[in-house]
Amino acid sequence: RLNNHHVLLITTTVVMLYTAASNALNDALDYEIDLINRPERPIPLGYVSIKGALFISFLLFAFGVALCLQLPDMAIVIGVFISLPLMVTYSTNLKGKYLIGNMVVSFLLGASFLFVGVSHEMTSPMLIPMLLAFGLTFLREIIKDVADIEGDLSLGLKTYPIISGVDSYRRIII
């Protein structure tokens, strides 16, 4: 059995590896959008190839899974069987879906608190941070959708500001 320091190190590392892997995957798949919205990113600038980003994503996810398998069973369920598939599905299918992508990203950030709590067998203290992370991340994701509206429109994404309008978005934020 791992002591608390090892569990904390493993859970923190898994969250970092998964986040980096998911970002690399998203960058590889968002290449065309980033040409418009974020042309200063490494892939549009040609510093990193799409294949290179996909390879890095795969490696980071694999290392994250390997570490996750050392944790208690419920943490493995959250890390390997819930969070990992959601991260990949978000990047491949859900990103531009009306509010669904925003909810998935928000859930994933909130779930990281649950993941740590389950790993330490102390879930209750993590419920409030989990809910706060979900709510604040959801607002942040909608704000990001407005900032990315030009590129998202050009590729036919169905984000909240595109479907409901920027005025509707402003009412939610305020």
Ranges and model annotations:
Residues 3, 36-37, 79, 97, ...:
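Non-catalytic, surface-exposed connector residues within folded enzymatic/regulatory domains
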Residues 27-34, 97-105, 122-129, 146-153:
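A cytosolic-side transmembrane-helix exit/cap motif
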Residues 43-128:
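Intramembrane alpha-helical segments
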